[in-house]
């Protein structure tokens, strides 16, 4: 399900890190239940798809260096999980999809060029062709992020002795905490960024990431309601479950209202490795993917 750039059969990286505006969640993949968090000063990271996210590079470099093991000069392989809003993730459907990689990229670029707010020529583009039954449309998951943004996130880790060979986004990694049953909606709130992912079984059907003016129940519903309506139109069925992550008290208090407004069961997303939050959901999901 994820767009991690992993070669089949490769062992997992030794470390995994998730970056947010609040800090760095991290852990060793050999001990997935032992996840920690190191806060960052306010303003060190400011997430955007349009500009450099690392506003205080010296501060980020110092905090990452503090996480490095004593033998950091050995270059430990690491997975790096980026904030959702610095990238763009979409699900494109095709009646037919070419087998040639270059033709695939050209077709994807043609379809998505006018929908992203940055230059495709300077972006890193990954795509995953999801399995489809004969006669069904082919759903392709596409993730794009400006190359310079990725480089700026990776640099302090490389300097500290880590080798971030795998890069994904928080919501994409968090999908590994969702059991592939029926139609499920995952909603993840991180600050004012709301990510919505909809799965039918293990197939991703919708990916949205919206910056809210404020994290109120009304603003959240203004994103969730159209998402449910879209799924009803496209899949001819309502989501059976809404999984919440990062909503804190708002989610606890508003869950009954959302259940009534959306007509779906509402519950928190869960992981065997801890309580998923706005700062570690991607990390815990990544750990779940290694255990699968």
Q: How would you describe each model-predicted region?
A:
Residues 1-292:
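Hydrophobic/aromatic-enriched cytosolic interaction surfaces used to assemble or bind macromolecules
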